[in-house]
Curated annotation (Swiss-Prot):
Pfam family name, one: HSP20
Residue numbers of N6-acetyllysine PTMs: 127
PANTHER family: HEAT SHOCK PROTEIN BETA-1 (PTHR45640:SF7), HEAT SHOCK PROTEIN HSP-12.2-RELATED (PTHR45640)
Complex formation: Homooligomer. Homodimer; becomes monomeric upon activation. Heterooligomer; with HSPB6. Associates with alpha- and beta-tubulin. Interacts with TGFB1I1. Interacts with CRYAB. Interacts with HSPB8. Interacts with HSPBAP1.
GO BP of this protein: anterograde axonal protein transport; chaperone-mediated protein folding; negative regulation of apoptotic process; protein refolding; regulation of protein phosphorylation; response to heat
Matching InterPro entries: A-crystallin/Hsp20_dom, ACD_HspB1, Alpha-crystallin/sHSP_animal, HSP20-like_chaperone
Originating organism: Canis lupus familiaris
UniProt-recorded name of the protein: Heat shock protein beta-1
Segments forming domain sHSP: 80-188
Modification Phosphoserine, positions: 13, 15, 27, 82, 86-87, 90, 102, 180, 203
Amino acid sequence: MTERRVPFSLLRSPSWDPFRDWYPAHSRLFDQAFGLPRLPEEWAQWFGHSGWPGYVRPIPPAVEGPAAAAAAAAPAYSRALSRQLSSGVSEIRQTADRWRVSLDVNHFAPEELTVKTKDGVVEITGKHEERQDEHGYISRRLTPKYTLPPGVDPTLVSSSLSPEGTLTVEAPMPKPATQSAEITIPVTFEARAQIGGPEAGKSEQSGAK
């Protein structure tokens, strides 16, 4: 079976920037375990100096003391860490009419994603080229594969990318074969002479003599 590249519909707005959360220096710390603070008391100070738009709320000035500050920062830390760990998580759904895979690819730009089918398998590839920051080098690679259900036409596979960074790949399920209508075939009755033919009639006459 030949390989086919599946184009996906880009549902993001034109102003969307896939690296908008990557620009601040501290916004890349979740990509490396050694960039995280070790103790809860350090979280408050670390988050207070972090430039993470959309991830962490500013710590209220009224909060005093390391324990109170850590308690205020912990929910924000959990949200950010949960978002990081959710990257690459997929969900497969199959109904009588449709087969669908949803994959979180929020860390990849549209031009870094490729969807193709080959030998009844959907292959999704996402790759970041190696980038350097103050902590070292960062690179990502995503290569999940999904086997299409039997009977699914690979040429009908389509994909789309949502504004939230969810890649959806889907295909219609094959329709079950329609059962043919029952047909009764009539049996035609033939006389004995017709069944035996002319030669049979002559044999009977010879026997009578």
